[in-house]
Amino acid sequence: MKAVGILGSPRKYGNASKMLDAALKELENSGFEVEKVHISSKKINYCTGCGTCLAKGECVQRDDMDELKRLVEESDAVILASPVYYLNVTAQMKTFIDRMLPYGHRPTLKGKYGGSIVVYAGVGKPEEVAGYMNRVLKAWGIVPVGYAVGFGVIPGEVGDEDLKKASQLGSKIAEAFESKYRMEPSDEDLELQKQLLTLIKNYGHLMKADYEFWKEKGFI
């Protein structure tokens, strides 16, 4: 069993990192082999919007995203962690998410479980940011079992109660994996899938990899 934590903070040892460590520690205690990836330490180019990944199934860029995609694919559990920057995830996390586009169009990460960790400085709605990352996980095919929100302005300020919430998230992910928990699609999920399939049907000549994926599954 493997678990990977994706840290979207530019700070390697900040509050989001501490909370992610707490969640990963709980997964490790449950028998998972864990790994944490600090996005800012990796070379990840912006998505250029060329569409090659949708047409041919593979990105034309060669950078550290190859390694990160492999880690996610090989993991049974995935946690996304980000501080709130201007009401949303950091630029680093958004760049990572943008480069994961093929998994949103072709959700091949089914059978995995995950969740989100958000740290904020008291401004905004961190639950909405966590909800966004969990919706991203769900779009990839991963079952999001929850999230943990913490408060911190100064690095290391996040408190014991918030660290406990992160640990509980790790425990919840481990339990979901063990029980093979299934999540029924919501009305929003079904509507998003309907919109995606309409897009792919209309532009199948540009999204050949997507078209063939869904055709094989009998949706087109």
Swiss-Prot record:
Its cofactor is FMN; [4Fe-4S] cluster. Gene3D superfamilies: 3.40.50.360. The lineage of its organism: Archaea, Methanobacteriati, Methanobacteriota, Archaeoglobi, Archaeoglobales. Keywords: 4Fe-4S, Flavoprotein, FMN, Iron, Iron-sulfur, Metal-binding. Binds 1 FMN per subunit. Homodimer. It comes from the Archaea. InterPro entries: Flavoprotein-like_sf, FMN_Rdtase-like_dom, ISF_SsuE-like. Belongs to the SsuE family. Isf subfamily. [4Fe-4S] cluster binds at C47, C50, C53, C59. Redox-active protein probably involved in electron transport. It comes from Archaeoglobus fulgidus (strain ATCC 49558 / DSM 4304 / JCM 9628 / NBRC 100126 / VC-16). This is Iron-sulfur flavoprotein AF_1436. The keyword Transmembrane does not apply. GO terms for molecular function: 4 iron, 4 sulfur cluster binding; metal ion binding; oxidoreductase activity.
